[in-house]
Amino acid sequence: AALCLPKDKDVLIITKENTDECDSMLAQGGVCVLKDVNDFKCYFEDTMKAGHWENDPDSVRVMIESSQEVIGTLIDLGVDFDTDKDGKYDYTREGAHRRNRILHHKDETGKEITDTLLDIAKKKENITIVPKTTMIDFIEKDNVCQGIVCEDEYGEMGSILARDIILATGGLGGLFLNSTNYPHITGDSFALAIKHGVELKDINYIQIHPTTLYSKKNGRRFLISESVRGEGAILLNENGERFTDELQPRDVVTNAIVEEMKKFGTDHVYITLPTMTTEQAAKRFPNIFDACMEEGYDITKDKVPVTPAQHYMMGGIKTDLYGRTSMAHLYAAGET
């Protein structure tokens, strides 16, 4: 958003921790895009079905129709998406998609996008970034947002007044015992929205990701991206049996895993990637491959223990198609 605003607008971005400690940096799989107009109907149906047809169809339509323009902008800004041996963009597949329509940068797509945009933002004279600063309240009168109250890393509090405020504070994974999110992502915007009467929507819709690297320790879980299953990985139960279609929507796969864990009295199942060689997996999924190897597993040959964990906030602050909330001059974007 900051990069899209006119240069004569002063923009202040505050982050709760350092700029590289955000969930966008952790996103692995990729970004869905409408490859051609003939795919629209299939793409729309896949998205609506995955959302149990509770999605806002207008929002889904806008998301799909604008995807090519958004991806084009990212490419123009310097984001590097993987290509195949012929130099064409390499589209992968993930759960609930009937077709390959996901662009990616190895298994660190979020980091590639976020680093690229941050590097540009840091060079803009009209953009100031202040890390380790926490929003603790809205400043509002008569349902018009006028700014925020914040606290820095030393406990000093202050007010920031602005004509418009955009909330992009992520989800609430830090409130969970096990989550793929950073621990400081604690749903701050949702709490303040409730306090000030800003309308929320589907706040109880919290996504559990089926496959995170199993650990007996509590805290942030390492994600085994859905795109690994899109490239042929399979799930196995305690008996080494395949028990579900791995590319169903995440809630369906998670429920199937939970049933297997109940059946065998375990707290994990297994994933393995028989469709790739060690060299191929290390190139396509370098971070995932290394994380598994650190635990003693070659994902192409071994059964890697995985377990579900909280991943994404599906609901949040209700907005219109322009990101406007029920409070004037207050906007919300992304997972918020």
PLM regions: where:
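An anion/pyrophosphate-binding glycine-rich loop and adjacent beta-alpha core
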Residues: 19, 192, 198-305
